[in-house]
């Protein structure tokens, strides 16, 4: 399937305008959020997960390497997002949280919730904003996560906060990926969460790809950048997104409205009814987010467990063990990538990536409340 890309399109013009607005078009871009992927390891194997997690020990950065990277970046006061795998499985995550507390930078943690009680004191000390992945209530959650008692571990953490640190709930959000496995249990999850004063609940549409899209992206990557794309967005379980499922997703809007006065609930991406149909279509998902602008290559670097720095899924710029962050992030390879993105407006797989749908406030920071 050919992708219509016009370098002189309105999207390209819009890109130049937005990137200029955020003063990011120069060759020196300052990150607003830095994703620290501490480990690829995870104690769960979620049905909808597209990351190739493993329980096998792999070479990971020493905590001293992370400290050095944070020190190099901390003058810019970005938000440091601890990610994985399961970031709380990283052997020295406690020491890293202690160091981040000293640097007085905003901290976020995305976690499956299994180890939250173990690190709750350190998370509170650093005032971390925590996003917990939940898929439902009781066995629905456990079965999707393929991890017995995982729901009870999260419920235990919430009960702990209720007794000992209720004010910290304002830092706690829940993300629920919608799938055919849990779509009929979403309201039960909302009802459960309504017992706790959490900050927000995000109902996320699946991230998924296909062999055809991966091959198309790889061909584009080789032509544009002379390298293969390592992007893999294939969940552990292959789902069918038929009309009946899409109808059930759309019906959730009325459920969310019913709870709107009691909880802060949103969909991500925020799609209207026609775009829901497009998003789940292999042929029409390119029509989604036609006015969207992705600033990840300027604003949100990812540092992988082995030290690789990525600006976009499937693109490695360099490694912090071999070169300084700033030389990599604002080097020739990333600036060339940014120019290509501005010219094309988007790449074939962009509408399948969550970064494509992120919103930004006027400072260029991610608007996490949307």
State each model region's role.
Residues 58-60, 142-146, 314:
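Short, solvent-exposed loop/turn segments at secondary-structure boundaries
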Residues 55, 86, 136, 207, ...:
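Flexible, active-site-proximal loop/turn residues at the rims of small-molecule/cofactor binding pockets
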Residues 129-135, 139-306, 310, 320:
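Radical SAM enzyme [4Fe-4S]-AdoMet core and its adjacent flexible, acidic
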Residues 1-30, 284-370:
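Flexible mid-to-C-terminal extensions adjoining Fe-S/redox cofactors in radical SAM and related proteins
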Residues 92, 205, 313-316:
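Short clusters of small/polar residues that mark proteolytic maturation junctions
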């Amino acid at each position: 399937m050919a992708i219509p890309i016009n370098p002189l399109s309105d999207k390209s013009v819009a890109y130049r305008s937005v990137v200029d607005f955020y003063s990011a078009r120069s060759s020196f871009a300052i990150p607003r959020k830095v994703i620290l992927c501490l480990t690829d390891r995870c104690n769960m194997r979620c049905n909808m997960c597209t990351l190739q997690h493993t329980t096998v020990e792999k070479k990971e950065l020493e905590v001293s390497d992370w400290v050095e990277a944070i020190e190099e970046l901390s003058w810019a006061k970005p938000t440091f997002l601890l990610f994985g795998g399961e970031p709380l499985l990283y052997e020295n995550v406690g020491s890293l949280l202690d160091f981040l507390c000293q640097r007085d930078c905003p901290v976020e943690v995305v976690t499956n919730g299994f180890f939250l009680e173990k690190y709750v004191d350190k998370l509170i000390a650093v005032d971390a904003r925590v996003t917990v992945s939940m898929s439902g209530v009781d066995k629905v959650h456990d079965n999707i996560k393929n991890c017995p008692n995982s729901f009870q571990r999260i419920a235990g953490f919430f009960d702990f906060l209720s007794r000992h640190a209720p004010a910290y709930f304002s830092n706690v959000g829940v993300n629920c990926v919608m799938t055919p496995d849990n779509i009929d249990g979403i309201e039960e999850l909302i009802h459960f969460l309504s017992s706790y004063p959490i900050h927000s609940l995000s109902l996320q549409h699946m991230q998924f790809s296909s062999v055809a899209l991966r091959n198309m992206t790889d061909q584009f990557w080789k032509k544009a950048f002379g390298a293969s794309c390592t992007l893999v967005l294939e969940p552990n379980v292959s789902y069918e997104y038929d009309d009946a499922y899409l109808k059930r997703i759309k019906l959730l809007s009325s459920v969310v409205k019913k709870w709107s006065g009691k909880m802060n609930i949103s969909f991500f991406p925020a799609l209207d009814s026609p775009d829901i149909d497009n998003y789940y279509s292999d042929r029409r998902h390119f029509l989604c987010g036609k006015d969207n602008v992705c600033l990840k290559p300027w604003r949100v670097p990812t540092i992988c467990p082995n030290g690789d720095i990525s600006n976009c899924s499937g693109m490695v710029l360099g490694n912090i063990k071999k070169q300084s962050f700033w030389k990599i992030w604002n080097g020739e390879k990333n600036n060339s990538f940014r120019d290509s993105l501005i010219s094309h407006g988007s790449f074939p797989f962009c509408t399948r990536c969550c970064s494509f749908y992120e919103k930004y406030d006027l400072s260029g920071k991610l608007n996490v409340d949307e």
